[in-house]
């Protein structure tokens, strides 16, 4: 099948720990990682086929090709660790910006920086939206106090809420739960 041959020539097929097929697509300025059955991969495949043949792909042909590619990734591909939005990396964490350039933010105790190609594999869901690139402190002063202007959190609870908020980005810890108690209204 032409679609399967096209993917095998341009991608690497793998699977994650849950045995979901994953395609790693090297691009000139980035690397994209899509689950085979997600719309992002199908969109990429339709565009690649259009560029190669200047033809569309019938729905039944696409479904058959995706099933074959998923089987190849699950049975022949290596298991790779795939992350959604955040991942532990060396001495810090990576946060996927979900932008068109597939950039991530590497956060360490010394600060943060934008990385163009993440050392870990990030995949995306169809509903993910891009996150803004942080503004360096030299350009504008970051002020966590602005958060409290938009929330009704008592001063004595703010440190706990801030710790909860930061821990939400750490994928290697138990998932924290914030219990908000107050009168309705």
Protein language model annotation of sequence segments:
Residues 27-29, 111-185:
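P-loop NTPase catalytic core of nucleic-acid-dependent motor ATPases
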Residues 1-137:
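N-terminal nucleic-acid engagement/recognition segments and initiation subdomains in replication
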């Amino acid at each position: 099948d032409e679609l399967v041959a096209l993917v095998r020539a341009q991608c690497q097929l793998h699977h994650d720990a849950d045995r979901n097929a994953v395609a790693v697509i090297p691009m000139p300025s980035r690397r994209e990682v899509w689950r085979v059955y997600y719309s992002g991969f199908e969109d990429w495949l339709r565009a690649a086929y259009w560029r190669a043949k200047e033809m569309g792909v019938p729905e039944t042909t696409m479904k058959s090709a995706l099933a074959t590619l998923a089987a190849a990734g699950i049975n022949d591909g290596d298991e790779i660790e795939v992350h959604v939005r955040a991942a532990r990396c060396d001495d810090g964490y990576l946060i996927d910006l979900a932008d068109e350039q597939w950039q991530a933010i590497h956060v360490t105790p010394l600060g943060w920086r934008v990385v163009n190609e993440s050392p870990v594999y990030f995949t995306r869901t169809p509903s993910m939206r891009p996150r803004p690139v942080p503004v360096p402190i030299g350009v504008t002063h970051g002020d966590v106090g602005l958060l409290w202007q938009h929330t009704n959190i008592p001063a004595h609870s703010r440190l706990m809420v801030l710790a909860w908020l930061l821990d939400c980005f750490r994928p290697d810890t138990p998932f924290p739960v914030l219990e908000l108690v107050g009168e309705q209204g």
